[in-house]
Swiss-Prot record:
<keyword id="KW-0007">Acetylation</keyword>
<comment type="function">
    <text>Actin-binding component of the Arp2/3 complex, a multiprotein complex that mediates actin polymerization upon stimulation by nucleation-promoting factor (NPF). The Arp2/3 complex mediates the formation of branched actin networks in the cytoplasm, providing the force for cell motility. In addition to its role in the cytoplasmic cytoskeleton, the Arp2/3 complex also promotes actin polymerization in the nucleus, thereby regulating gene transcription and repair of damaged DNA.</text>
</comment>
<dbReference type="GO" id="GO:0042995">
    <property type="term" value="C:cell projection"/>
</dbReference>
<dbReference type="GO" id="GO:0005634">
    <property type="term" value="C:nucleus"/>
</dbReference>
<keyword id="KW-0963">Cytoplasm</keyword>
<keyword id="KW-0206">Cytoskeleton</keyword>
<keyword id="KW-0539">Nucleus</keyword>
<dbReference type="GO" id="GO:0005829">
    <property type="term" value="C:cytosol"/>
</dbReference>
<dbReference type="GO" id="GO:0034314">
    <property type="term" value="P:Arp2/3 complex-mediated actin nucleation"/>
</dbReference>
<feature type="modified residue" description="N-acetylthreonine">
    <location>
        <position position="2"/>
    </location>
</feature>
<dbReference type="InterPro" id="IPR008384">
    <property type="entry name" value="ARPC4"/>
</dbReference>
<dbReference type="GO" id="GO:0005885">
    <property type="term" value="C:Arp2/3 protein complex"/>
</dbReference>
<comment type="subunit">
    <text>Component of the Arp2/3 complex composed of ACTR2/ARP2, ACTR3/ARP3, ARPC1B/p41-ARC, ARPC2/p34-ARC, ARPC3/p21-ARC, ARPC4/p20-ARC and ARPC5/p16-ARC.</text>
</comment>
<comment type="similarity">
    <text>Belongs to the ARPC4 family.</text>
</comment>
<keyword id="KW-0009">Actin-binding</keyword>
<dbReference type="GO" id="GO:0035861">
    <property type="term" value="C:site of double-strand break"/>
</dbReference>
<keyword id="KW-0966">Cell projection</keyword>
Amino acid sequence: MTATLRPYLSAVRATLQAALCLENFSSQVVERHNKPEVEVRSSKELLLQPVTISRNEKEKVLIEGSINSVRVSIAVKQADEIEKILCHKFMRFMMMRAENFFILRRKPVEGYDISFLITNFHTEQMYKHKLVDFVIHFMEEIDKEISEMKLSVNARARIVAEEFLKNF
């Protein structure tokens, strides 16, 4: 892990652990409905102040909390055009399989690459520390995966260029 990644991930972990103090809260508008307040935004008193944790200007996490849900949006580092394309394709692949990841949203928040929605039902069914570990592990692995894919693409491009230039 790089020197800047460890404090960044520990700050995200601590903030997520604090934000995941969720409780069941029925809708104030419709009887017998329970919707994530962070998505619905029906009343301001149920929403917490959003927290942004940045590693640099392009790599950041937005944690929006409410009384019964937390939305975690992640912007993955994209240093060049190849990383942008790889990140976009990889995130699209993940979001197409959102039903397999219970907390993954199909559509990310504007300005971010991927979003997770954790409701009070998720914290009742799963361990809170395991949810936090999943998000942190996802952030670690996505960085590694995109770096590995970029190396693979560059190696393949080098081989193709060498084969092409053999003809001249």
